[in-house]
């Protein structure tokens, strides 16, 4: 009984009872035209309308005067909401608010700016003389009160519920009394209250399920970018930005997607409201029960989770309530504007790379107010931009008003380019009319040409992939023409990062039609049979077994004691290791020192520390001892003899993945299951790597290549080994998961690891860039990430970026990784030389050009990838891009000049000698010498220069045996010089 009375008393204290205030204040009320009759209709219907209506309170003449205060706070808060108003259902219920800048008084600079798809001006009139009693409040101020048309009030359950619904980010009026009060009455009471009380009632309404018809169509989205908290509606793209971060319950209760927006999600007309709340020194604060607030907040969070769309299910269905299921609390990313910086080759003009005029991009910038300066390069986004331009041109040419049912805003970018002011009507005989009509036809023709090239079995992102490959091939062809080393680097990039899938012409495959070709192929096959037998790998284990899986060693892979190591490994240097592991959230950690301090167990300690710090062992129900058993077994299956692809590389990729997952733009986007799956994929992505490339395994007809049909051979093998190790006793870290959760995680891990195949690089890049630019062109600027395909695409690119993150690390780390990778390449080249195979590009230790290869690697592979990732999470990756550019400049400065400095004095003589040994030039020189009467001197000079040529040739041939450093072109040129000298 006492507890019940206490709760009732607390609720009474929390209820915002109306209080009489002594000082009157001028009230300004914005009403639709219609006079007193219309206002009477509103008052008549007020009794049946229980929904509070939003109002905006403004200070006088820009002064800091607030009608309401925020409890326990003396700071200034500014809240801006960009939502969507207008549209409505097909029945046209409710009118959209419309208007421009409304100036109430010359001395009062308050304005309410709205935009809508309706072309008529908003009929508001100014009502003055209305005063309200303010009680003990010591200041006078004015306020605006938005009142919607009676038709929208009578259609409250329809789609256009715009301003008749509750606004959690504004002050609201009382529900029952508002319509009964005459705005001219001085005894009217103020129904405003502080922000926390407003949020408290918002929580009560959410917990009670009010307005569920509209809230069921939204998914809450919280994405923090830069220094401010940003809440983004996944259904309409509105953003709520506060001066400081609020509590989770407060943010959830102010998910404004359905509060100021139509529920059918067809309106994208933006309306901006700005609310300022400033505390005053002598205001009486309204107190409420914190216990009730916390209870209702918990109910609100639980309700929001139940309403979240399941976004990471295998079947793209609705997720369950468990945190392990696909329903993520926030399912989207806010795309920001990008700064001006050095751009990759993807942003160069299409006309320089594509011969067909049908493939040239017509739009180089986005027709969007929020992303007006961002360039678009993907064909599908360019098609959308062109079609949007065609639509806007059609509206200008036909003078047809835009329909309220359209969810696309009116944009007159094309009209502006044609020299005509936006929104101005055009006459048929004007020059601007003819020019705009011609541009429209050209835009439409270009779109049709592009759409005709789309094949039915390919996605729209393949258009970007094919375009990027053509541009890269053109770039590499120019790069290879520069020098012999450039040709080698181009071959390496093409063979490694471009998929070998090609379109085959079926009739051309019929070789039996040409008997001569058949005979030639048979002879060539007999000649190469012996060489093929020598280059073929020895027979391995039966294909029914997974090669590389060792028998588990219980004495080294299991922990029998009660105490587990603090960082997962037993090491005498635990303090030093703990200091380094404390910086796991830092980009460019000293990973080599971690490998040293962890007794060559970097992967185990890094993975264990990350899973512990993220509380994934608890959320995913992983026993710590089982996790350590699996990680130790996994690390044992990494080949320690590999210079690069060993457990240290896996630890580096896992740590980089952890840092990228901590990106502020991705905060709260992914569930624990998704985060754990991405980290698990990073741990296993190179297990049992033989230190050889996929192309080598295919060329040598290895057992792995035969087993996986030459398709992502190593990546499939890594997955098979890792999931096989989970079947070892005491190693199944996912044993406590439900069957559906385990299937989801397995599919996710498979997709992520397969995406680490470097031949899929261009497809991954094209998919991500198409998705980002399409959302920008659409005008929303928000990636909803509300289905499995979009979410796994982001995670695939995240791990792929981590796998290619060495050039973005500090220069000492980068140089060390480069040396290890090149040594592994050289070992493969040595094996190819011994087997009589063709040496792969960049694998010949005698002709490698390390510096130039790194510059080409950054320019054509790493920079475009990280540029796109930085576009996605801007501005969180700007420091990484800066480091990448610095490292690129360093290697560019280290490229030996051509010719090298050591041969500067010899090169002019060598070039002169090459022309002297030519017959015609020699005769001319001898003739000139005979005419001068100095024949003997000329002969001695010729003999001396010839000896110099031979000496330089010998010195050049002797210097060609060294390693890389850009010596290959000079060595090849010197080897031909003795032949000239002997002529």
UniProtKB/Swiss-Prot annotation:
The active site is at residue 645. It is an enzyme of class 3 (hydrolase). A divalent metal cation 1 binds at residues 649, 685-686, 803. Keywords: cAMP, Hydrolase, Metal-binding. Its cofactor is a divalent metal cation. PROSITE patterns: PDEASE_I_1 (PS00126), PDEASE_I_2 (PS51845). One of its GO terms (biological process) is associative learning. Monomer. This is 3',5'-cyclic-AMP phosphodiesterase, isoforms N/G. It comes from Drosophila melanogaster (Fruit fly). The lineage of its organism: Eukaryota, Metazoa, Ecdysozoa, Arthropoda, Hexapoda.
């Amino acid at each position: 009984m006492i507890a019940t009375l206490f709760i009732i008393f607390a609720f009474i204290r929390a209820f915002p009872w109306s209080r009489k205030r002594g000082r009157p204040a001028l009230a300004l009320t914005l009403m639709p035209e219609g006079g007193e009759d219309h206002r009477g209709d509103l008052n008549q219907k007020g009794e049946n309308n229980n929904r509070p209506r939003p109002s905006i309170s403004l200070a006088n003449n820009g002064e800091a005067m607030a009608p309401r205060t925020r409890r326990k706070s003396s700071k200034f808060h500014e809240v801006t909401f960009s939502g969507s108003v207008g549209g409505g259902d097909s029945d046209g219920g409710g009118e959209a608010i419309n208007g421009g800048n409304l100036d109430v008084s010359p001395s009062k600079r308050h304005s309410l700016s709205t935009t809508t798809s309706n072309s008529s001006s908003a009929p508001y009139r100014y009502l003055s003389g209305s005063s309200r009693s303010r009680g003990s409040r010591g200041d006078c101020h004015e306020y605006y009160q938005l009142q919607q048309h009676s038709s929208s009030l009578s259609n409250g359950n329809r789609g256009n519920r715009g301003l008749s619904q509750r606004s959690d980010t504004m002050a609201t009026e009382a529900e029952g009394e508002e319509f009964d009060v005459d705005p001219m009455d001085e005894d009217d009471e103020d129904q405003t209250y502080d922000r926390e009380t407003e949020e408290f009632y918002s929580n009560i309404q959410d917990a009670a399920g009010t307005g569920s018809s509209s809230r069921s169509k939204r998914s809450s989205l919280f994405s923090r970018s830069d220094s401010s908290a940003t809440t983004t509606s996944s259904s309409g793209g509105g953003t709520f930005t506060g001066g400081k971060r609020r509590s989770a319950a407060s943010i959830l209760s102010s998910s404004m997607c359905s509060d100021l927006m139509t529920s059918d999600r067809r309106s994208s007309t933006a309306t901006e409201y700005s609310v300022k709340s400033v505390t005053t020194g002598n205001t009486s604060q309204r107190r409420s029960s914190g216990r009730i607030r916390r209870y209702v907040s918990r109910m609100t969070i639980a309700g929001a989770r139940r309403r979240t769309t399941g976004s990471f299910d295998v079947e793209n269905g609705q997720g369950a309530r468990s945190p392990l299921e696909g329903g993520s609390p926030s399912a989207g990313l806010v795309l920001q504007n990008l700064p001006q910086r050095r751009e990759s080759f993807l942003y160069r003009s299409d006309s320089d790379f594509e011969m067909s005029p049908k493939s040239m991009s017509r739009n180089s910038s986005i027709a969007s107010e929020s992303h007006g300066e961002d360039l678009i390069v993907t064909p599908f986004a360019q098609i959308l931009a062109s079609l949007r331009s065609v639509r806007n041109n059609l509206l200008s040419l036909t003078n047809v008003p835009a329909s309220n049912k359209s969810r696309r805003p009116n944009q007159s970018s094309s009209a502006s380019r044609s020299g005509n002011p936006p929104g101005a009507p055009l006459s048929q005989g004007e020059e601007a009319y003819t020019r705009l009509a011609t541009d429209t036809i050209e835009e439409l023709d270009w779109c049709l040409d592009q759409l005709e090239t789309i094949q039915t079995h390919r996605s729209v992102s393949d258009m970007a992939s094919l375009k990027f490959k053509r541009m890269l091939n053109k770039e590499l062809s120019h790069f290879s023409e520069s020098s012999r080393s450039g040709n080698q680097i181009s071959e390496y990039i093409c063979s490694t990062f471009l998929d070998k899938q090609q379109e085959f012409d079926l009739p051309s495959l019929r070789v039996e039609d040409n008997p001569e070709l058949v005979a030639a192929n048979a002879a060539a096959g007999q000649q190469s049979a012996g060489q093929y037998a020598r280059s073929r790998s020895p027979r391995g284990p039966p294909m029914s077994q997974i090669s590389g899986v060792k028998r588990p060693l219980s004495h080294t892979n299991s922990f029998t004691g009660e105490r587990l190591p603090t960082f997962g490994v037993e090491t005498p240097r635990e303090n030093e290791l703990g200091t380094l592991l404390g910086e796991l959230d830092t980009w460019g950690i000293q990973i080599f020192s971690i490998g040293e301090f962890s007794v060559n167990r970097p992967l185990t300690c890094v993975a264990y520390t990350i899973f512990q710090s993220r509380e994934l062992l608890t959320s995913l129900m992983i026993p710590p001892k089982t996790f350590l058993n699996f990680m130790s077994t996994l690390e044992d299956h990494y080949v320690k003899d590999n210079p690069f692809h060993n457990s240290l590389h896996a630890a580096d990729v896992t740590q980089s993945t952890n840092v990228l997952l901590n990106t502020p733009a991705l905060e709260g986007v992914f569930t624990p299951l998704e985060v754990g799956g991405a980290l698990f994929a990073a741990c296993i992505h190179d297990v049992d790597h033989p230190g050889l490339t996929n192309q080598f395994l295919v060329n040598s007809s290895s057992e792995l290549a035969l087993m996986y049909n030459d398709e992502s051979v190593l990546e499939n093998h890594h997955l098979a080994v890792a999931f096989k190790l989970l079947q070892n006793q005491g190693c199944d870290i996912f044993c406590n998961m439900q069957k559906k959760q385990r299937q989801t995680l397995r599919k996710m891990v498979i997709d992520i690891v397969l995406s680490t195949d470097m031949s899929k690089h261009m497809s991954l890049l094209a998919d991500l860039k198409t998705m980002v630019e399409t959302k920008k062109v659409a005008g929303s600027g928000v990636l909803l990430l509300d289905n499995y395909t979009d979410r796994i695409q982001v995670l695939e690119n995240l791990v792929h970026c981590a796998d290619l993150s060495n050039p973005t690390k500090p220069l000492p780390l980068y140089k060390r990784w480069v040396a290890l990778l090149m040594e592994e390449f050289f070992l493969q080249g040595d094996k190819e030389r011994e087997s009589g195979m063709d040496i792969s590009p960049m694998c010949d230790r005698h002709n490698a050009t390390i510096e130039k290869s790194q510059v080409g690697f950054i320019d054509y592979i790493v920079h475009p990838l990280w540029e796109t990732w930085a576009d996605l999470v801007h501005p969180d990756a700007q420091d990484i891009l800066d480091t990448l550019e610095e490292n690129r400049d360093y290697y560019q400065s280290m490229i030996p000049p051509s010719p090298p400095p050591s041969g500067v004095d010899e090169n002019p003589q060598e070039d002169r000698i090459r022309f002297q040994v030519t017959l015609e030039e020699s005769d001319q020189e001898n003739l000139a010498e005979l005419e001068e009467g100095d024949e003997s001197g000329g002969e001695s000079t010729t003999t001396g220069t010839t000896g110099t040529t031979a000496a330089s040739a010998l010195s050049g041939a002797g210097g060609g045996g060294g390693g890389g450093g850009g010596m290959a072109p000079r060595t090849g040129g010197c080897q031909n010089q003795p032949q000239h000298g002997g002529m």
